[in-house]
């Protein structure tokens, strides 16, 4: 592995640059873009793949990090499919022509005719401004306006280009502000050629099952074993063929290449991401702070007995430390209803949630993402005592008069308390794989978080396998060590 050094200034910005790439005349350029796709098609990561293809051909450009795929607040109703923005961090001698190229490429290749509202921001500098980093953190769990983004863009002298209503600049700014210096994962995404977009994707299911079994837990959410579903392929008309998510770039690459597809692909690229980190649920809230479309978690006490709705959905209510109450919805596809319906008043829980806004026929509701049962309340039933002689149940003699066995004539004043055994236990409960959002943290990742760099000497990008142009996945090259 090559030797790398990390300057103190770069360490603060969580940007690691190899020592041989830190020439005096290289500037660090951060390129962020979002909202280039629509429900009808295209994909922001695909544009990142194509832009990277261009940048890799330029001798004066060096990547200082993997391309970043940053998933933002998944509860935003006007988001495109995955609410993912992209950031490319490069070292270069000349920024102006790169910015012009990316700006023009995004304006030409975004799905504007179908409602895309792309935004592109470019910032030069080693250290990302604090205001941009805070904006990025907020974008993970709250609603931010275009005006919020524009104020920071102006104050920090960030170059910004937008089309349509320009909402993409919100995600673009958030992307360059997310440094992923803490937990993160990787995803190797393969892309279809233009002529194949919209046609059925063909994958060998047995190879996917084998790959998943061999690589778990270094890869995750490849399949939903309970419902027998493949999870690595999207279902829409976008150019993504499949994506393998995991803990390190080598494993996701080897896993992708093992699938041996017959379809000729445009290529593939590895992203460093915040997927699978629960990054949107790390802010603790009280109900007085809750607003529509926010995400977070709250600790509270069950204050209303759960009840099951038609279709298997479950509703219950919890109160927080201020004794404010909120209804909680547990939808059938999550498979959490079987746990939620067994809660009783007085149980202490943590819940991760997204906020559904109030509408004509329902109030504001917390949509459950995870349930942590911290303390189960005891359920005690009072029964008439047993006769110590014949072991039959005694009869009440009347209010305040105690109990008597009708056969043995033995009397007692004491009632008999029975603690009911609960069918659930204290612990952490997560929805089924098929209901996971991009940001949902799988159970096996708790306690296995990554840091960056997580090995001596960062994995550079590009490397022998992290970017590949046109061919079959089985036209693979040997995965060499970095």
Give residue spans per PLM region.
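Long, hydrophobic alpha/beta structural blocks
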Residues: 98-108, 112-289
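OB-fold nucleic-acid-binding modules
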Residues: 257-305, 310, 339, 372, ...
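Short nucleic-acid-contacting surface segments enriched for D/E, G, S/T with interspersed K/R
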Residues: 295, 334-351
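Flexible glycine-rich surface loops and low-complexity tracts that mediate binding to linear polymers
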Residues: 298-303, 345-361
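OB-fold (S1/OB) nucleic-acid-binding surfaces
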Residues: 305-333
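Long, charge-rich boundary regions
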Residues: 344, 417-482
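OB-fold/S1-family single-stranded nucleic acid-binding modules
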Residues: 356-384
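Short cysteine-rich clusters marking metal-coordination/redox-active sites
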Residues: 387-390, 405-408
């Amino acid at each position: 592995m090559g030797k790398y050094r990390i300057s103190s200034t770069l360490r603060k910005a969580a940007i690691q640059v190899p020592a041989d790439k830190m020439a005096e005349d290289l500037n660090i350029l951060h390129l962020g873009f979002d909202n280039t796709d629509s429900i009808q098609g295209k994909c922001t990561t695909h544009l990142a793949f194509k832009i990277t293809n261009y940048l890799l051909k330029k001798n004066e450009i060096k990547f200082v990090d993997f391309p970043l795929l940053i998933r933002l607040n998944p509860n935003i109703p006007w988001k495109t499919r995955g609410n993912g923005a992209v950031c490319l961090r490069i070292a270069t001698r000349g920024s102006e022509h790169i910015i012009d190229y990316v700006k023009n490429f995004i304006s030409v290749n975004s799905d504007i005719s179908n409602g895309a509202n792309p935004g592109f921001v470019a910032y030069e500098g080693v250290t990302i401004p604090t205001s941009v980093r805070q904006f990025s953190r907020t974008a993970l769990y709250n609603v931010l306006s275009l005006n919020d983004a524009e104020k920071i863009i102006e104050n920090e002298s960030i170059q910004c280009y937008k089309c349509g209503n320009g909402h993409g600049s919100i995600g673009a700014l958030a992307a360059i502000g997310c440094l992923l210096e803490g937990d993160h994962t990787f995803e190797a995404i393969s892309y279809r050629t233009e002529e194949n977009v919209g046609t059925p994707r063909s994958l060998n299911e047995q190879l996917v099952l084998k790959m998943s079994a061999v690589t778990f837990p270094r890869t995750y959410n490849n399949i939903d074993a309970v419902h027998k579903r493949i999870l690595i392929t999207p279902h829409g008309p976008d150019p993504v063929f499949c994506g393998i998510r995991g803990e390190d770039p080598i494993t996701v690459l080897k896993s992708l290449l093992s699938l041996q597809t017959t379809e000729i692909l445009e290529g593939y690229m590895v992203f460093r991401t915040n997927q699978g980190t629960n990054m949107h649920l790390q802010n603790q809230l009280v109900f007085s702070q809750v607003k529509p479309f926010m995400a977070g978690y709250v600790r509270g006490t069950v204050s209303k007995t759960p009840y099951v709705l038609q279709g298997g959905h479950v509703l219950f209510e919890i109160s927080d430390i201020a004794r404010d109450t909120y209804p909680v919805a547990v939808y059938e596809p999550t498979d959490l209803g079987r746990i939620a319906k067994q809660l009783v008043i007085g149980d202490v829980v943590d819940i991760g949630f997204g906020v559904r806004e109030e509408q004509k026929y329902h109030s504001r509701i917390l949509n459950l993402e995870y349930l942590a049962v911290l303390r189960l309340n005891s359920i005690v039933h009072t029964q008439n005592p047993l006769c110590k002689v014949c072991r039959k149940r005694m009869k009440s003699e009347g209010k305040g008069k105690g109990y008597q066995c009708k056969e043995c004539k033995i009397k007692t004043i004491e009632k008999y308390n029975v603690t009911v055994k609960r069918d659930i236990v204290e612990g952490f409960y997560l929805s089924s794989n098929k209901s996971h959002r991009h940001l949902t943290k799988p159970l096996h990742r708790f306690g296995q978080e990554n840091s960056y760099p997580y090995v001596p000497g960062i994995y550079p990008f590009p490397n022998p396998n992290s970017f590949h142009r046109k061919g079959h996945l089985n036209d693979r090259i040997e995965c060499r060590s970095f």
